UniProtKB/Swiss-Prot annotation:
It comes from the Bacteria. GO terms for cellular component: cytosol. This is Ribosome maturation factor RimP. The gene is rimP. Keywords: Cytoplasm, Ribosome biogenesis. It comes from Acaryochloris marina (strain MBIC 11017).
Length: 150
């Protein structure tokens, strides 16, 4: 059920320049609650974003009859994520310690820890103890904030 909700919600979110970051259906409440978390990659996610998404997604879910019984739809922001996914994240957290994980070993390592210095079309750049590191974006599985550089 949740994968279908995400499949329906993603194009709705894209219309408003939003991203769906998760969904959960809480059946322990009466009526059950469908919570969809969204994020605006261009600005802080605000109440207006949640309202627009709620109205538009409600219409899509009702039309598709995903939930035949009564439910409550909640749209919210997940808050600060440790994963860096959009350009805004890479600008906001420049200079912060990050952990970069790669699909395959890159130069013998699956993980790289250092201070984020930038990201462009081809590379994510780190400073690792004064040494610049460039990791090709196609090699990267994920980039996340890290507690402290090694």
């Amino acid at each position: 059920m949740i994968p279908k909700v995400i499949d329906l919600a993603a194009p709705v979110a894209a219309q408003f320049n939003l991203e769906v970051v998760g969904a959960v259906f809480q059946t322990n409440q009466s009526p059950p609650v469908l919570r969809v978390d969204i994020r605006n990659c261009d600005a802080d996610t605000g109440l207006e974003d949640c309202e627009k998404m709620s109205r538009a997604l409600e219409a899509v879910l009702d039309e598709d009859d995903v939930f035949p019984e009564a439910y409550v739809l909640e749209i919210s922001s997940p808050g600060l994520s440790t994963l860096l996914t959009c350009d805004r994240d890479f600008v906001s957290f420049r200079g912060f310690p990050v952990l970069v994980q790669t699909h395959q070993p890159y130069r013998g390592h699956h993980q790289w820890i250092g201070n984020l210095t930038g990201r462009d079309e081809k590379f994510v750049q780190l400073n690792q103890k004064g040494r610049p590191i460039k990791i090709p974006r196609e090699e990267i599985l994920q980039v996340q904030l890290h507690d402290s550089p090694e």
